[in-house]
Every structure is written in C-alpha cells, then in structure tokens.
C-alpha cells in the first residue's frame, strides 16, 4: 500500500528512504521505466534531512551521533560514547540460537542502552512493534547474518557480502553520485501506482477494481478458480500480495497446513496524523525523531515533512509534520473495544507536536488515517513459518507465489522487490511442472 494525498495546501503521505543496495537500484529502474525521472524529488546526502535524526528522551530531542567524531564523544541520551559499544561488540562471541528477539540480540552485543533506546525506537518506527517480541533474524537479517558469518555486526557490515549485479540508468547514476537518502515524487507518492496502472493497462493487462476475492479453489486440471463474489475467473498461477492472514482464509481445504502457517503471521494497526501549521518553525532541522516505548507508549515518532520536501508545502506554504501513533497504547485501545475516533487521534497527535516540537498553536489543516492491521509483525520464529510455507508449496507443487509485506520486509522498497521476484519465479515455472 502506498498512501499519499496531494492537495493544494500540500502533499501528505509516504516518502521513501533511498538506502544503498540492490533494492534501491531495482526501484530506481522501475521509476525510470514508468517515465517518472523528472518527477523525482531527492534528498541528497548533504541535506539536513539526510544527516540529522533525533530521539525524544526525557522530554528532550537528542541528535543521533553520526561520523567518527560523533561516535568518539559522549552523545546523550547515551551515557558513554557509542565507540565503546562498538569496541565491546567486537569481543562478543557469536550467538548460538537459531533466532533471538531484537532486544536480546542488541543487549547482548551492544549493551542495554542501545537496546532500550536505539533498537526499541527503531522497531517502533519501522514495524510499530515491540523489540522484545520481534525477531532479529527476520526484521534485521543483515545484522543476524553479519554475526553468523563474521562473528561481529561491525565486521560483517564492513566486509559485506560482496557486490551483486545492479541495474543502471541515468537516475540511478545520479542517485549514487549525490548519495540520495530518501525521495518522493512531485505530485506525491500516489503518482507511482497511478503510473504503474497506466503502464500495465496500455499493454493489455486487465486491472479489476472493487472486486474482492472471496475464495480460491483448485480445479481438476490444476488451475485456480478465483471467486469474486458474483463472478469468478480462472488462473494458471496466482501471485498473492494480500496479508498472510487474509490469504489463510481464502485457501482451499487441501492447503490447510499452509493456511495454518500463514494465519499466525499477525499485523498491528497504526494511526497516521498529518498536521500543517502556518507560520510555525521547528526547533531542529532533520528527517524526524523516534520515541522509545519508555517515553510515550502512544507516539512512535514524528517525521518533519517540510524539511525534506519543502516543494510539497502547498500555497501558501505551511510547516508539515506527520505523527505516527500505535504501539501498546493503540493495541490496548483495540483490545478494550474503545471507540477509535479521528478526534482521539488528532488530539493525541497535536499534544505530541506541542510537547515534543513546541508547536502549540492549533494546526491549519489535519488529516487522520487509521490503518488497521497494516504492518506485519515478524515475531520470534518467523523464519520457520516461511520455511514451512515454502516446503508445502514445493511439495504440493501449488501454482501459488507469496509476495508482499507479510514475509521478508515491510517497506515499500521491500514490497517492490518482493513483487519483482515473485514475477520472475512465476514466469520461470510452467503450470503443473
């Protein structure tokens, strides 16, 4: 899902980190293929939004240390230079467990402060989840593999796994040269699915809208019957990008073992509140800040949209921030059956913006979206669920490919790559082969 809304008063919605690696180049190639190069708004490596990220701890915004100098000196809220945590990490033995929670892994290798402040906040910002429950192997596979392969996170990340073949385009070369850290599109991220729709339909691809799938059944010839309420269609192969728990309800009885594995992949809800202020200024310049669970159980973090993309501030321009609400606070509200009103989320977001950023005046505009069960949670042992699903699909030779956020990455970047790999696998597999 890409949520973005472009209004005269400004663009509200997603922006994507442009992190180094294969997924970056695959995504850059897609943007070029869709003819969107001229619409890209990059954040270059020397921009404040690329260099500055903050933690909100004890009522204070602290800049996360960057560069060697930042690692060598004390950087509150950490009591000691992070250099010592890195040095300590080099001496730690390799873990022996097949999986481990993010908190346990970080505490064992980097110490309690990094675990309870940095990794706790990171898990809330990326997964809206609890670092004491999420799997290091599935949520941060590069860290897990670094320890397994090189006995050290730092050594593993420094030595890397070698360079893989990378696509090339003028946009990708520009991104490399300018060290892009994130990007958006001039008309908002909604331009991406819109351009993809145009690209596909112009090539004869049928896109069905407003027709939810009500069931999947296997026919005697090995093809799928896809039920769509009052109608149906037949398919040689199905690529499913719906949440795993949703797919588990659609599968036929013959796929009960697969359905059981998928049903256990749960997801959490997140409320996203976009606020715009006239004549306001931020106390700091950067990408935004994260909030550890010990500080505020409701607020996951706040993104400073106007710092990265002032081009989208609208006319007349106004300061835009995005407040993300969730975590244990929202889970308790859902469990208790409380009324989850827009007023509740707006009040909570405005209070956070006032307390954490000093934005005490009422916003000129506010948009509230509650995304139910939108971010899958890769709990301890998630990798075993994927292995079980993969083994069942192979053994039964089902013409079904799993893709999307439920499996190996929740970011838009991960989902794009997941879809690409699913298409490659489906095209290389003959029906009933």
Predicted features and spans:
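Glycine-rich FAD pyrophosphate-binding loop
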Residues: 1-12
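Active-site/ligand-binding neighborhood in enzyme catalytic cores
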Residues: 49-51, 60, 70-72, 81-218, ...
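Mid-domain catalytic core of redox enzymes
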Residues: 209-335, 343, 352-356
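Local beta-strand N-terminus motif with an aromatic residue
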Residues: 38-39, 235-236, 363
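Dinucleotide-binding Rossmann-like beta1-alpha1 core, especially the glycine-rich loop
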Residues: 12-94
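Conserved flavin/dinucleotide-binding core of flavoenzymes
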Residues: 10, 65-69, 284-287, 300-433
């Amino acid at each position: 899902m890409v949520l973005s809304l472009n209004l005269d008063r400004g663009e509200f919605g997603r922006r994507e980190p442009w992190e180094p690696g294969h997924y970056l180049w695959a995504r850059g190639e897609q943007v070029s293929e869709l003819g969107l190069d001229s619409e890209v708004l990059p954040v270059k490596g020397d921009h404040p939004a690329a260099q500055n990220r903050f933690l909100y701890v004890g009522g204070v915004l602290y800049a996360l240390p960057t560069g060697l100098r930042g690692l060598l000196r004390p950087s509150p809220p950490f009591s000691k230079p992070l250099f010592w945590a890195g040095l300590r990490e080099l001496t730690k033995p390799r873990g022996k467990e097949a999986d481990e929670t993010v908190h346990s892994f970080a505490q064992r290798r980097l110490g309690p402060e990094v675990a309870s402040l940095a990794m706790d906040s990171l898990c809330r910002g990326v997964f809206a989840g609890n670092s004491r429950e999420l799997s290091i192997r599935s949520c941060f596979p590069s860290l897990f593999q670094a320890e397994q392969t090189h006995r050290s996170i730092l050594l593993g990340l420094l030595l890397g796994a070698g360079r893989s073949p990378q696509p090339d385009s003028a946009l990708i070369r520009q991104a490399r040269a300018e060290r892009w850290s994130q990007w958006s599109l001039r008309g908002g991220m909604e331009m991406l699915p819109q351009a993809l729709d145009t690209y596909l339909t112009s090539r004869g691809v049928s896109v069905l809208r407003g027709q939810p799938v009500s069931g999947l059944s296997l026919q005697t010839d090995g093809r799928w019957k896809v039920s769509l309420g009052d109608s149906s269609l037949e398919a040689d192969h199905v690529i499913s990008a719906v949440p795993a728990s949703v797919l588990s309800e659609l599968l036929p009885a013959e796929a009960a073992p697969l359905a059981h594995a998928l049903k256990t992949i749960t997801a959490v809800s997140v409320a996203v509140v976009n606020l715009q202020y006239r004549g306001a200024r931020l106390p700091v310049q950067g990408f935004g800040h994260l909030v550890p669970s010990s500080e505020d159980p409701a607020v996951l973090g706040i993104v400073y949209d106007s710092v990265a993309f002032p081009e989208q501030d609208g006319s007349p321009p106004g300061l835009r921030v995005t407040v993300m609400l969730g975590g244990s606070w929202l889970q308790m509200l859902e469990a208790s059956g409380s009324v989850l009103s827009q007023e509740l989320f707006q009040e909570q977001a405005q209070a956070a913006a006032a307390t954490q950023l000093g934005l005490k005046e009422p916003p000129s505009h506010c948009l509230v979206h509650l995304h139910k069960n939108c971010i899958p949670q890769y709990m301890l042992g998630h990798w075993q669920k994927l292995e079980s699903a993969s083994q069942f699909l192979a053994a039964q030779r089902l013409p079904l490919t799993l893709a999307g956020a439920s499996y190996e990455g929740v970011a838009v970047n991960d989902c794009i790559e997941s879809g690409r790999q699913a298409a490659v696998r489906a095209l290389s597999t003959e029906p009933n082969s």
